[in-house]
Amino acid sequence: MNDINLNEKHFLEHETVLKSINKYTKKKISRAAEIISKSLKNKGTVYWCGNGGSASDSLHLSTELIGRFNKNRKPLKSVSLASNSTSLTCIANDFGYDKIFSRQLEALGKKGDVVIALSTSGNSENILQTLNQAKKNRVYSISFLGKNGGKCKDKADLEILINSKSTARIQEMHITIGQIICDLIEKKLKL
């Protein structure tokens, strides 16, 4: 396969997954923005977490709220649980990698906050434990999942599932959906 054909293959896969986003999923995206906006309006904090590329997306999306998405505005309370290397390595070393996000949420999360957990497979034990911890702390949980949702399916208060087997395509949709949510938040909060 030459470069042009490979390019075309990737664009076609992206287009197919994008077209699979139905009205039901779009309503969930709007609902996520509503929940997060309400939390932020009431002085809540939005927590993000994910592994690998999803960790990068959690940092990116958290920064869209702290910095800005489309408009210059006041910063919004948002934290990526994947960003503090000292906490991550301490928790992984002392308690196990499966606790790297849930332990932080246990310490920081409170009723009225929101956690958004990203996992392309839905099988990351640390994401599953974070969703379980969210329930204990009464933190509203949103999951961005892919494939068939894995072990995390039906564990969050609100689930956005991308029906694809391609990690790259799932991550593309997760970041797109996250940015749509950031845009909706700015509009809902009239910032």
Regions found by a protein language model. Give the residues of each.
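Generic N-terminal amphipathic, Lys/Arg-enriched alpha-helix
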Residues: M1-Y24
